[in-house]
Amino acid sequence: MLALERRNLILEKLQAEKRVVVSELSQLYDVSEETIRRDLDKLEKEGLAIKSYGGAVINEDVSIDLPFNVRKNQNVTGKQKMAELAAALVKDGDHIFLDASTTAVFVAKALKEKERLTVITNSMEILLELADVSGWNIISTGGVMKEGYLAFLGSKTDESIRSYYVDKVIFSCKALDPEWGIMESQEAFGSTKRAMIGSGRKRILVVDSSKFDQTAFSVAGSMKEVDIIVTDKEPTERWKKHFEKFNVKCLYPV
Protein backbone atom coordinates (compact mmCIF):
# COMPACT_ATOMS: atom_id res chain seq x y z
CA MET A 1 0.00 0.00 0.00
CA LEU A 2 1.31 3.44 -0.94
CA ALA A 3 1.75 6.02 1.82
CA LEU A 4 -0.82 8.31 0.17
CA GLU A 5 -3.39 5.50 0.06
CA ARG A 6 -2.76 4.73 3.73
CA ARG A 7 -3.10 8.38 4.74
CA ASN A 8 -6.39 8.63 2.86
CA LEU A 9 -7.66 5.55 4.70
CA ILE A 10 -6.56 7.05 8.01
CA LEU A 11 -8.36 10.25 7.07
CA GLU A 12 -11.54 8.32 6.24
CA LYS A 13 -11.30 6.62 9.63
CA LEU A 14 -10.82 10.01 11.30
CA GLN A 15 -13.89 11.35 9.51
CA ALA A 16 -15.97 8.42 10.71
CA GLU A 17 -14.64 8.06 14.26
CA LYS A 18 -13.22 11.57 14.97
CA ARG A 19 -10.16 10.04 16.68
CA VAL A 20 -7.51 7.43 15.85
CA VAL A 21 -4.89 5.62 17.96
CA VAL A 22 -1.35 4.98 16.70
CA SER A 23 -1.09 1.42 18.02
CA GLU A 24 -4.42 0.41 16.45
CA LEU A 25 -3.50 1.92 13.08
CA SER A 26 -0.14 0.17 13.18
CA GLN A 27 -1.85 -3.21 13.53
CA LEU A 28 -4.61 -2.38 11.04
CA TYR A 29 -2.24 -1.42 8.21
CA ASP A 30 0.65 -3.71 9.23
CA VAL A 31 3.25 -0.96 9.49
CA SER A 32 5.38 0.34 12.34
CA GLU A 33 4.06 2.87 14.83
CA GLU A 34 6.78 5.25 13.66
CA THR A 35 5.36 5.05 10.12
CA ILE A 36 1.90 5.88 11.46
CA ARG A 37 3.30 8.84 13.40
CA ARG A 38 4.86 10.17 10.18
CA ASP A 39 1.48 9.76 8.47
CA LEU A 40 -0.19 11.74 11.25
CA ASP A 41 2.55 14.39 11.06
CA LYS A 42 1.79 14.78 7.36
CA LEU A 43 -1.97 15.02 7.94
CA GLU A 44 -1.40 17.63 10.66
CA LYS A 45 0.84 19.73 8.38
CA GLU A 46 -1.91 19.63 5.75
CA GLY A 47 -4.38 20.90 8.35
CA LEU A 48 -6.49 17.73 8.21
CA ALA A 49 -5.76 16.32 11.67
CA ILE A 50 -4.62 17.48 15.09
CA LYS A 51 -2.16 15.20 16.86
CA SER A 52 -2.98 14.14 20.40
CA TYR A 53 -1.37 11.84 22.95
CA GLY A 54 -1.10 8.40 21.33
CA GLY A 55 -3.00 9.37 18.19
CA ALA A 56 -4.88 12.21 16.52
CA VAL A 57 -8.29 13.84 16.22
CA ILE A 58 -9.99 15.21 13.13
CA ASN A 59 -9.67 18.91 12.35
CA GLU A 60 -13.32 19.88 11.93
CA ASP A 61 -12.59 23.36 10.59
CA VAL A 62 -14.99 23.73 7.64
CA SER A 63 -12.40 25.76 5.70
CA ILE A 64 -10.16 22.70 5.37
CA ASP A 65 -10.50 20.81 2.07
CA LEU A 66 -10.28 17.04 2.30
CA PRO A 67 -8.78 15.10 -0.63
CA PHE A 68 -11.25 14.41 -3.44
CA ASN A 69 -11.19 10.63 -2.97
CA VAL A 70 -11.96 11.03 0.73
CA ARG A 71 -14.83 13.46 0.13
CA LYS A 72 -16.25 11.16 -2.53
CA ASN A 73 -16.75 8.45 0.09
CA GLN A 74 -18.55 10.70 2.56
CA ASN A 75 -22.35 10.57 2.92
CA VAL A 76 -22.65 8.27 -0.10
CA THR A 77 -26.29 7.37 0.56
CA GLY A 78 -27.25 11.02 0.92
CA LYS A 79 -25.42 11.97 -2.27
CA GLN A 80 -27.11 9.17 -4.20
CA LYS A 81 -30.56 10.31 -3.07
CA MET A 82 -29.81 13.94 -3.91
CA ALA A 83 -28.40 12.89 -7.28
CA GLU A 84 -31.60 11.04 -8.17
CA LEU A 85 -33.69 14.11 -7.33
CA ALA A 86 -31.41 16.40 -9.33
CA ALA A 87 -31.30 14.03 -12.31
CA ALA A 88 -35.11 13.95 -12.41
CA LEU A 89 -35.04 17.70 -13.18
CA VAL A 90 -33.03 17.14 -16.36
CA LYS A 91 -34.84 16.47 -19.65
CA ASP A 92 -33.59 14.54 -22.67
CA GLY A 93 -31.69 16.89 -24.94
CA ASP A 94 -30.77 19.38 -22.20
CA HIS A 95 -27.50 21.29 -22.16
CA ILE A 96 -26.11 21.32 -18.61
CA PHE A 97 -23.14 22.38 -16.53
CA LEU A 98 -21.81 20.02 -13.85
CA ASP A 99 -19.21 21.40 -11.45
CA ALA A 100 -16.21 19.56 -10.02
CA SER A 101 -17.81 18.61 -6.69
CA THR A 102 -18.04 15.01 -5.53
CA THR A 103 -21.81 15.48 -5.39
CA ALA A 104 -21.85 16.29 -9.11
CA VAL A 105 -20.10 12.97 -9.79
CA PHE A 106 -23.12 11.19 -8.29
CA VAL A 107 -25.44 13.35 -10.39
CA ALA A 108 -23.47 12.36 -13.50
CA LYS A 109 -23.98 8.69 -12.66
CA ALA A 110 -27.71 9.24 -12.12
CA LEU A 111 -28.07 10.99 -15.49
CA LYS A 112 -26.92 8.04 -17.59
CA GLU A 113 -30.46 6.96 -18.49
CA LYS A 114 -31.08 10.31 -20.19
CA GLU A 115 -30.66 10.78 -23.93
CA ARG A 116 -28.89 13.37 -26.10
CA LEU A 117 -27.48 15.41 -23.23
CA THR A 118 -24.72 17.95 -23.67
CA VAL A 119 -22.64 18.06 -20.49
CA ILE A 120 -20.02 20.75 -19.91
CA THR A 121 -17.81 20.20 -16.88
CA ASN A 122 -14.55 21.21 -15.24
CA SER A 123 -14.35 17.83 -13.49
CA MET A 124 -11.85 15.22 -14.70
CA GLU A 125 -13.73 12.59 -12.69
CA ILE A 126 -16.99 13.36 -14.52
CA LEU A 127 -15.26 13.37 -17.91
CA LEU A 128 -14.01 9.85 -17.19
CA GLU A 129 -17.36 8.75 -15.75
CA LEU A 130 -19.25 9.82 -18.89
CA ALA A 131 -16.61 8.93 -21.48
CA ASP A 132 -18.45 5.80 -22.66
CA VAL A 133 -22.00 7.19 -22.74
CA SER A 134 -23.22 7.08 -26.34
CA GLY A 135 -25.26 9.82 -27.98
CA TRP A 136 -24.09 12.58 -25.63
CA ASN A 137 -21.84 15.58 -26.17
CA ILE A 138 -19.24 15.79 -23.40
CA ILE A 139 -17.32 19.07 -23.26
CA SER A 140 -14.35 19.86 -21.02
CA THR A 141 -13.87 23.45 -19.94
CA GLY A 142 -10.12 23.01 -19.98
CA GLY A 143 -7.92 25.10 -17.73
CA VAL A 144 -5.30 24.34 -15.11
CA MET A 145 -5.69 21.04 -13.27
CA LYS A 146 -5.88 21.62 -9.51
CA GLU A 147 -3.73 19.05 -7.72
CA GLY A 148 -5.73 16.75 -5.46
CA TYR A 149 -9.12 17.98 -6.71
CA LEU A 150 -9.44 16.50 -10.22
CA ALA A 151 -10.76 19.91 -11.24
CA PHE A 152 -9.91 22.42 -13.96
CA LEU A 153 -9.75 25.95 -12.56
CA GLY A 154 -8.46 29.40 -13.42
CA SER A 155 -9.13 32.22 -15.85
CA LYS A 156 -9.16 29.96 -18.92
CA THR A 157 -11.75 27.72 -17.26
CA ASP A 158 -13.97 30.66 -16.34
CA GLU A 159 -13.62 32.15 -19.83
CA SER A 160 -14.66 28.83 -21.37
CA ILE A 161 -17.70 28.58 -19.09
CA ARG A 162 -18.85 32.09 -20.00
CA SER A 163 -18.81 31.19 -23.69
CA TYR A 164 -21.82 28.89 -23.15
CA TYR A 165 -25.41 29.37 -22.01
CA VAL A 166 -27.11 26.19 -20.81
CA ASP A 167 -30.52 24.95 -19.73
CA LYS A 168 -29.41 23.91 -16.25
CA VAL A 169 -26.44 24.50 -13.97
CA ILE A 170 -26.04 21.73 -11.39
CA PHE A 171 -23.49 22.50 -8.70
CA SER A 172 -22.63 22.11 -5.03
CA CYS A 173 -20.75 24.25 -2.51
CA LYS A 174 -18.54 24.16 0.57
CA ALA A 175 -20.90 26.12 2.81
CA LEU A 176 -24.32 27.77 2.82
CA ASP A 177 -25.00 30.74 5.06
CA PRO A 178 -28.26 32.76 5.32
CA GLU A 179 -26.37 36.06 5.17
CA TRP A 180 -23.36 35.31 2.96
CA GLY A 181 -25.03 32.81 0.64
CA ILE A 182 -23.15 30.18 -1.38
CA MET A 183 -19.53 29.85 -0.30
CA GLU A 184 -16.33 28.06 -1.30
CA SER A 185 -13.08 27.44 0.55
CA GLN A 186 -10.88 28.86 -2.21
CA GLU A 187 -11.25 31.84 -4.54
CA ALA A 188 -10.57 29.73 -7.64
CA PHE A 189 -13.57 27.52 -6.87
CA GLY A 190 -15.70 30.54 -6.02
CA SER A 191 -14.80 32.22 -9.31
CA THR A 192 -15.69 29.13 -11.36
CA LYS A 193 -19.01 28.73 -9.54
CA ARG A 194 -19.84 32.39 -10.21
CA ALA A 195 -19.12 31.86 -13.90
CA MET A 196 -21.41 28.82 -14.01
CA ILE A 197 -24.23 30.49 -12.09
CA GLY A 198 -24.20 33.36 -14.57
CA SER A 199 -24.31 31.06 -17.59
CA GLY A 200 -27.50 29.06 -17.14
CA ARG A 201 -31.26 29.42 -17.38
CA LYS A 202 -32.01 27.34 -14.26
CA ARG A 203 -29.58 27.03 -11.32
CA ILE A 204 -29.81 23.87 -9.20
CA LEU A 205 -27.76 23.78 -5.98
CA VAL A 206 -27.26 20.24 -4.68
CA VAL A 207 -25.94 20.46 -1.12
CA ASP A 208 -26.23 18.21 1.92
CA SER A 209 -27.58 19.50 5.21
CA SER A 210 -24.18 19.47 6.95
CA LYS A 211 -23.20 22.51 4.84
CA PHE A 212 -26.11 24.63 6.14
CA ASP A 213 -25.20 27.40 8.61
CA GLN A 214 -21.53 27.18 7.65
CA THR A 215 -19.24 29.80 6.16
CA ALA A 216 -16.12 29.56 4.02
CA PHE A 217 -13.59 31.91 2.43
CA SER A 218 -15.04 32.86 -0.97
CA VAL A 219 -18.57 33.97 -1.86
CA ALA A 220 -19.70 32.08 -4.96
CA GLY A 221 -23.24 33.39 -5.26
CA SER A 222 -26.38 34.55 -3.48
CA MET A 223 -29.63 32.76 -2.74
CA LYS A 224 -31.49 34.94 -5.23
CA GLU A 225 -29.37 33.35 -7.99
CA VAL A 226 -30.65 29.85 -7.16
CA ASP A 227 -33.85 28.37 -8.55
CA ILE A 228 -33.88 24.96 -6.84
CA ILE A 229 -32.04 23.53 -3.84
CA VAL A 230 -31.72 19.77 -3.51
CA THR A 231 -30.64 18.50 -0.09
CA ASP A 232 -30.49 15.20 1.79
CA LYS A 233 -33.13 15.80 4.45
CA GLU A 234 -35.93 18.16 5.36
CA PRO A 235 -34.54 21.60 6.28
CA THR A 236 -35.47 23.43 9.46
CA GLU A 237 -38.42 25.84 9.41
CA ARG A 238 -35.96 28.73 9.53
CA TRP A 239 -34.28 27.56 6.35
CA LYS A 240 -37.62 26.83 4.67
CA LYS A 241 -38.69 30.42 5.29
CA HIS A 242 -35.34 31.64 3.98
CA PHE A 243 -35.83 29.70 0.75
CA GLU A 244 -39.40 30.97 0.41
CA LYS A 245 -38.14 34.55 0.81
CA PHE A 246 -36.08 34.11 -2.36
CA ASN A 247 -38.64 31.94 -4.19
CA VAL A 248 -36.27 28.98 -4.09
CA LYS A 249 -37.87 25.56 -4.43
CA CYS A 250 -36.42 23.00 -2.01
CA LEU A 251 -36.39 19.26 -2.77
CA TYR A 252 -35.39 16.49 -0.37
CA PRO A 253 -36.04 12.73 0.06
CA VAL A 254 -39.28 11.79 1.85
Predicted regions and their residues:
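Hydrophobic/small residue at the entry helix of a nucleotide-binding pocket
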Residues: 103
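HTH-adjacent hinge/linker in prokaryotic transcriptional regulators
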Residues: 2-5, 9-24, 28-29, 34-100, ...
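Conserved phosphate- and dinucleotide-binding cores of soluble alpha/beta proteins
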Residues: 2-5, 12, 19-25, 30, ...
